[in-house]
């Protein structure tokens, strides 16, 4: 059985797409993950097993001039050396890198050993690690055609790797989780790991207005529950069955991280996207603009939002749900099978 090395990390957005691919390729290949002793390990280890998770000391890239950057070249060199040792031991046929600082030394080590590398970029613009390694890769795959257009002849737009469990999402189980009966339209609000606090604050202000017409379910994030109890409102810190909850929702208000928007589009969910304004290179705004131009969502500027404008966006998303779903269908967001086929080649 051939071995494929998966890598990527720094945020969950660099890990979860790999897990989506591992889920469908693990019967054909030995799937190994190289990551740090952090979030990658917590998320990826259950997918590959302890014997197939290899931990490295990856140096985080800092975009600003800081004293830590003075030692970065030495830290990266040590990480690359560590990865060379791991790859020599594994002798993989391919390295699949999903971006983030964790993937950089793995890819560099693979180049040194002449192991083919395929990268995938989820966002509308390419992240730093992928930009640094793309020219030596066997293939550059992207979720957005705008990213593929800037990456040369080896680039192709495939769509995004998506967890196939979205297609077995159960609306009835989602309703049970929310506590709502489905007689009114349901709005699900989720801010993600980085953008929950400010989105929760906005919802708190808008809640009296929004709940006049809709039931609202908030996935608040750990330790970020709203200090309020109101009719037509329910919340949880975290949801293991988030796809069931999405299935029960009539519209989702969310940040515009690539994984979130592609999964929601694959589920054909009307959405109001509120880009995280402090995203590192403005990628969330670019993602939201792309989906808006394709007719797949509505967008809102966080700094300009009021309770009234948020309610208005939700009203418009509900009214335009059928058109939005048609646009999402035409977009063909799920690239899991296409990417798996590229890996098999």
What is each model feature region?
Residues 3-9, 30-75, 158, 301-303:
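Conserved nucleotide-sugar phosphate-binding/catalytic loop shared by glycosyltransferases and other
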Residues 30-32, 50-51, 111-172:
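Active-site-proximal region of nucleotide-activated glycan assembly enzymes
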Residues 33-35, 39-49, 167, 171-173, ...:
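Donor-nucleotide binding loops and adjacent catalytic segments primarily
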Residues 65-94, 112:
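An amphipathic, basic-hydrophobic alpha-helix
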Residues 92-94, 247-262, 269-270:
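Acidic donor-binding loop of glycosyltransferase active sites
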Residues 294-322:
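C-terminal "capping" alpha-helix adjacent to the active site of nucleotide-linked donor transferases
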Residues 316, 332-345:
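C-terminal alpha-helical cap of glycosyltransferases
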Residues 322-333:
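A short, well-ordered alpha-helix in the C-terminal region of glycosyltransferases
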């Amino acid at each position: 059985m051939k071995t494929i090395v998966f890598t990527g990390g720094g945020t969950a957005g660099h890990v979860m797409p790999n897990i989506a691919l591992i889920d469908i390729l693990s019967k054909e290949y030995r799937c190994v993950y190289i990551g740090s002793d952090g979030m990658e390990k917590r998320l990826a280890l259950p997918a590959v097993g302890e014997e197939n998770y290899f931990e490295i000391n990856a140096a985080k890239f800092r975009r600003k001039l800081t004293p830590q950057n003075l030692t970065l070249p030495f830290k990266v060199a040590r990480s690359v050396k560590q990865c060379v040792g791991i790859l020599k031991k594994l002798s993989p046929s391919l390295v699949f890198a999903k971006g983030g600082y964790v993937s950089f030394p793995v890819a560099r080590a693979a180049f040194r050993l002449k192991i083919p590398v395929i990268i995938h970029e989820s966002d509308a613009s390419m992240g730093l690690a992928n930009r640094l390694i793309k020219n030596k890769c066997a293939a550059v795959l992207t979720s957005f055609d705008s990213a593929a257009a800037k990456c040369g002849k080896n680039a192709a737009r495939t769509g995004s790797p998506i967890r196939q469990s979205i297609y077995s999402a159960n609306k009835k189980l989602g309703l049970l989780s929310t506590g709502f009966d489905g007689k009114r339209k349901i709005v699900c609000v989720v801010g993600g790991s980085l953008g929950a606090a400010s989105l929760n604050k906005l919802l708190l202000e808008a809640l009296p207005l929004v709940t006049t017409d809709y039931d609202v379910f908030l996935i608040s994030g750990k330790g970020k529950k709203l200090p309020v109890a109101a009719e037509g409102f329910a919340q949880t810190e975290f949801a293991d069955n988030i796809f069931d909850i999405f299935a029960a929702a009539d519209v989702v208000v969310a940040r515009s991280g690539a994984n979130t928007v592609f999964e929601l589009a694959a589920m054909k969910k009307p959405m109001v996207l509120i880009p995280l304004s402090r995203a590192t290179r403005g990628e969330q705004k670019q993602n939201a603009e792309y989906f808006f131009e394709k007719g797949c969502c509505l967008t809102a500027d966080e700094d300009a939002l009021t309770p009234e404008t948020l309610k208005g966006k939700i009203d418009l998303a509900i009214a335009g749900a059928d058109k939005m779903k048609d646009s999402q269908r035409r977009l063909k967001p799920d690239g899991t099978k296409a990417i798996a086929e590229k890996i098999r080649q």
